[in-house]
């Protein structure tokens, strides 16, 4: 800080002259307290220095609220106020770098759906245990699993016709009902198996790569050609067998016709011999 001309003049005077000037003042003038000076000839406090000390006190008060008064952010060379310091010191939130890759439930595979349901069930059980330990009312876990557990495996299928019941016989009606339930149960099992197999087959195909799908397609074409060759061979064999069977049938039919003709001839001869025998018996008696 640069010294003013008044301060330079005060430094030029000796301490003895300053004391004499203070004691030899006007008799009516008020007595001013003597100013303190150090032995090194330091300058007295100026209004600028006093204002700077007040800013330091204000900065210290702000530091008592949790701010560091000696940090370069809270104390500037120009002597900033507390409002400016507080306005400058703001916490800016940044977006989280961790991104959650969320997928819809319908796009998940069967294994991923089971894993998500298992995690949700474990989390719900843990929360319910914590609430029960704190004495809070606990509601049952909101899930549809109880519907699957309570589903009747013998649920009748409305598309399958039931047996006609006769009101006159109770035993026959019970037998018809049990038979209808058995058919409905079998139809339900076949339908459930086909749906499960189709879902599993679709998921397995979705999990394969393009090269694997091409290799499977070529393998299926090879099996199809083998099956077609086997079908043609069986058809030819069946045709040959059919021709042989037709020939045998024709031979047997001809043999049957021959035997019928022979039988008819023998019957006629037998009748003729019977007539001749009767004629011979009548002649000796006459």
From Swiss-Prot:
The modification Phosphoserine is found at residues 29, 39, 51, 53, 71, 76, 81. GO terms for cellular component: cytoplasm; cytosol; nuclear speck; nucleoplasm; nucleus. Residues 226-286 are annotated as: Interaction with CCNT1, HEXIM1 and HEXIM2. Residues 207-277 form a coiled coil. Residues 140-143 are annotated as: Interaction with P-TEFb. Residues 113-132, 178-195 have a biased composition (Basic and acidic residues). Residues 1-11, 68-78 have a biased composition (Polar residues). Ubiquitously expressed with higher expression in testis. HEXIM1 and HEXIM2 are differentially expressed. The keyword Coiled coil applies. Induction: Up-regulated by HMBA (hexamethylene bisacetamide) (at protein level). Keywords: Coiled coil, Nucleus, Phosphoprotein, Repressor, Transcription, Transcription regulation. Residues 1-195 are annotated as: Disordered. It is found in: Nucleus. The keyword Phosphoprotein applies. The modification Phosphothreonine is found at residues 32, 46. One of its GO terms (molecular function) is cyclin-dependent protein serine/threonine kinase inhibitor activity. Gene3D superfamilies: 6.10.250.2910. Residues 87-103 have a biased composition (Basic residues). GO terms for biological process: negative regulation of DNA-templated transcription; negative regulation of G2/M transition of mitotic cell cycle; negative regulation of transcription by RNA polymerase II. Homooligomer and heterooligomer with HEXIM1; probably dimeric. Core component of the 7SK RNP complex, at least composed of 7SK RNA, LARP7, MEPCE, HEXIM1 (or HEXIM2) and P-TEFb (composed of CDK9 and CCNT1/cyclin-T1). Interacts with CCNT2. The coiled-coil domain mediates oligomerization. Transcriptional regulator which functions as a general RNA polymerase II transcription inhibitor. Core component of the 7SK RNP complex: in cooperation with 7SK snRNA sequesters P-TEFb in a large inactive 7SK snRNP complex preventing RNA polymerase II phosphorylation and subsequent transcriptional elongation. PANTHER family: HEXAMETHYLENE BISACETAMIDE INDUCIBLE 1 (PTHR13469), PROTEIN HEXIM2 (PTHR13469:SF3). Belongs to the HEXIM family. This is Protein HEXIM2.
């Amino acid at each position: 800080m640069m010294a003013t001309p008044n301060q330079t003049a005060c430094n030029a005077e000796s301490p003895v002259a300053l004391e004499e000037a203070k004691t030899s003042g006007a008799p009516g003038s008020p007595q001013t307290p003597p100013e303190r000076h150090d032995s090194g000839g330091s300058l007295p406090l100026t209004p600028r220095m006093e204002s700077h000390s007040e800013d330091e006190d204000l900065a210290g008060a702000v530091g008592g609220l949790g701010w560091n008064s000696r940090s370069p952010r809270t104390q500037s060379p120009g002597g900033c106020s507390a409002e400016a310091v507080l306005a400058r010191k703001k916490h800016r939130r940044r977006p989280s770098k961790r991104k959650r890759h969320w997928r819809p439930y319908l796009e998940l595979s069967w294994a991923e759906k089971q894993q998500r349901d298992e995690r949700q069930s474990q989390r719900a059980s843990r929360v319910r245990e914590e609430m029960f330990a704190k004495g809070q009312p606990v509601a049952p876990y909101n899930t549809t699993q109880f519907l699957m557990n309570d589903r009747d495996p013998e649920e009748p299928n409305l598309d399958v016709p039931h047996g006609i019941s006769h009101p006159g016989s109770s035993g026959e009606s019970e037998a018809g009902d049990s038979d209808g339930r058995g058919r409905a149960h079998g139809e339900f099992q076949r339908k459930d198996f086909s749906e499960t197999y189709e879902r599993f087959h679709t998921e397995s195909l979705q999990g394969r790569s393009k090269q694997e799908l091409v290799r499977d397609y070529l393998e299926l074409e090879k099996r199809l050609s083998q099956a077609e060759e086997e079908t043609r061979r069986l058809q030819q064999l069946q045709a040959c067998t059919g021709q042989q069977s037709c020939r045998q049938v024709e031979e047997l039919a001809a043999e049957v016709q021959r035997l019928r003709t022979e039988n008819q001839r023998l019957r006629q001869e037998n009748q003729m011999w019977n007539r001749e025998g009767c004629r011979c018996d009548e002649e000796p008696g006459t």
